[in-house]
Structure formats: C-alpha cells, structure tokens
Amino acid sequence: HTRLVSDWSSDVCSSDLFVDPQKDGGRMNEAAQDPLVERITIDGQQYLRYLPLPVDVALLKGSTADEDGNISLEEEPANLDIYAMAAAAHNSGGKVIFQVRRKVPRGKLSARSVRIPSAIVDVVVVDPDQRQSYEIVYDPSISGEQRDDQLSLEAPDFSLRLAIARRAKTELREGDVINFGFGIPDQIASMLAAEGTDERYYQTIEHGTYGGKLLTGTLFGYARNPSCMIDAPSQFDFYSGGGLDTAFLGFGQIDQEGNVNVSKLDGVTVGPGGFIDIAQNARKVVFCGTFDAKGAKFETGHGQLSITRPGQIRKFVEKVDQITFSGKQARFQNQQVLYVTERAVFRLQEKELELMEIAPGIDLQKDILDQMDFLPLIPENLKTMDASIFMDDQNG
C-alpha cells in the first residue's frame, strides 16, 4: 500500500490508482512521456511523490494592491491556492501578474490583510469593474465581509437526483466534519440550508471554505455567510491528515471491487480534481449518482419508482476504465463506503459490493441485476428504501 506526497500534502493512496507510476503515472495517453510522479520510501512505507512543475506565468486575481504590490483578498469568494500559485511561479523564475479592483497608498493595507507579499508580485493591473465571479458582480456575504441575516434558500424541486441526495443525507451524523462534491452531493447542502439544519455539521469545501450556505451549480465552492476561509492547500492538508468524517462525492463508473472512476469517461479525460485526496482519506465515503446514464426514463408516484426505459450507458461495470478511488485501499484503511443511486444502495464489503437496499417499485432482476456487468452480494434480508424519499411534496 502506497501513500502520496507532494510539496504540500500527503494522501493515503494505493498502487491501484491511475496516478501511480506503475500504472498510468497520471499520464492520459501514449503521447505523454514525461514522468509526473515517482515512488519513494519514508520510514519503510511507500509514498507517491509528485514531481515539481516549473511555472512560467501565474495570472491571478486579488481585491486590493498597495503601491508596493502587496495584495489583499477581502472581496474574493475563496482564497483558493492563490498564494501557492504565486510562490510557485516566483520560485520557478516566472512572472506573477495580479488583477485587482483598486490600488491604495503604501501602508493602507494592514499586515494581517495582506495575503500575497509584494516580494513575489511582478505586475499589478487595476480593473475597477472586475467581477467577484463570472456570475456575480459582488456579494459581501460570499466574501465573508458581511453577514446576510435575511438570507433564505428554497428547497430544490423534486427530481431523481434529489431522491438520491435525500437517501445519502441519512448517512449524516450531527457534529460530522463533511465535504460535498460537485453535482448530486451539493443538493444535500441545498437541503440542509433550506431546512436550517446546516449548522448541525461542520461543512467544508476543498476550496478552503467552512460553514455557511454552500452554493451550487456554477458557484460551487463558494458559500454565503461562511464561518471561515483558509487556503486550499491547507484544506487539503487537513483532509489528507484524516480530518474528514464523511465525504459525499459523485461517480462515473463503479466495478465489482468497489473501485470508482471519475477521471476518464468514455475515452474523454475529465481529471480527478481533489477527488483522490478527499475520497481516500475520509473515514466514510458516500458516492452519489444515477444508476445508469443517457436516456433513462422514470415514473414516480405514491412513494414508488418505476423504470420505463433504462439508460444507454452502464455505470456498474466489470472493470472501470480508470481507477480514481481504490476499493482495495479503502478496505485496507477500514473506510466505510456506500454507493447510493435512485434505485439501489450498495456498500463495500471484504471482497466485493453488497446490495443493501432497493427502491420501492423496483424489480430486482430486471431493473438492477440485468443492468449491471457483475453480480453483487445479495443478502437474505434485502431492505427497501424509505418511500418518503420519492415523494415530490417532501422538502427534505
């Protein structure tokens, strides 16, 4: 079993993962020949070390610059890895270029407000009309400068994606430190915000945000009324050290060993983002997604689910195209792993996947087993998912 280290994080990883040099080494096709990662041994244990990449130019956005080039981020929706990128470019002999909204005289920025020192900034461009994000001009409740105590969010409309999120939400425990991934998992955050129960948990996003009303869609990674903002590399240090109780993440493919692929789908490179760091280090991982994809048709009513047409693309396959989450490593670390779909819930067992629950109205053979490339374990006491999950008048 292998761990992964870089200049700022160490993550529990397995040689099964596509980033291991004995597998793909993070390379996406045969044309990519340069080594990106190597195996090293520390205290008798194997790690994966990502090789440093020289950065020629870093184009970054801040809020305010003083005459010396010190940069503050008070209006930004997240700290992200802005400092790390600037430092990497500077230390590589590259250029660091910042766009800011305003420029102030020397000494007007307090030392505590400066997030990027002038020593590593080469160029400052002032744009008084810069937007907070491409969708929002400026919202001080997102940057954490002000609280919006009148904020109210509506529960998302019913859909099968919401039904999946409802079932996944039942895995929460009060006081958990949690992470929500993009897509179906972020609907869990929307439900918690609409219910007013979000403060029962410590919600985090890998961009560095803690607490608040997590935003979804194109604004994923931001929050209104956040309680804390740290740099993304520090957030991943926390994740890699085992700080997450539960992570809710999406999936593209799942195989019989519990491996998950999100990084290469139908031959198209999507990339893992922070998925590996989060999934392989959380104590509990709840994968959320539709059972199949492309063209599936459903009917719901009276707490029942009916599949009128299966999807054209199977997600439960004999072998995933690329391993972004290792079931083998999860077993080694005693992680609790669930796979939640609209029609079935699985869990990772000692050697394979076990079917835990099926949706009311679903035919086990026709709607589940015939739509999979492998046969999961099926317990004698197979349970039925709560019918309320499929009620379109339920708010959470």
Annotated model-derived regions:
Residues E145-D231:
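N-terminal active-site beta-alpha-beta segment that forms phosphate/nucleotide-binding
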Residues R3, D7-D149, T216-N395:
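Conserved phosphate- and dinucleotide-binding cores of soluble alpha/beta proteins
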